[in-house]
Amino acid sequence: MDAKQVLVMAATMLTAMGAPVFAQHAREPYVRVAEIEIDPAQLGAYTAAVKEQIEAAIRLETGVLALYSVADKDNPAHILVFEMYADTDAYKAHLETAHFKKYKVATQDMVKSLKLRETIPILLGSKSR
């Protein structure tokens, strides 16, 4: 499975949310995808840091609707993070949180490359597990 297939799966597997979620016309969520290449020697430490950051963001931030971090099966050092926020203000607020800043400092020397992709929601759906 290549990175694009992983991304498509992540976008369609919005299962962490309790009820169906659909993009609203008046206020669509802000959705982006981060493509991150990690130093393979530091992959374990990176995985721990991203898990801690995502768990804190989901628990503490009402504007964070979904965060999914997945690794490419053929290249585990290639990470994709699907991010969905209530709106751009929620995203900006997320960037200022202590847990996000801690993650950025902790991982700055682990990240070999970072590409942020802006997206346009077409249809976002999920169901309970």
What are these regions (language model features)?
Residues D2-L7, M13-V31, Y68-A77, K104-R129:
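Glycine-rich beta-strand-turn "strand-cap" elements at beta-sheet edges
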Residues V6-L7, H25, E52-A66, M84-E118:
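An amphipathic, aromatic/His-enriched active-site/gating alpha helix that lines ligand/cofactor pockets
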Residues P29-E37, A66-L95:
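Short, well-ordered beta-strand segments in beta-rich or mixed alpha/beta enzyme
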Residues Y30-L60:
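N-terminal targeting signals for Sec/Tat export/insertion, comprising classic cleavable signal peptides
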Residues L43-A45, H78, A90, G125:
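Intrinsically disordered, low-complexity acidic/polar segments
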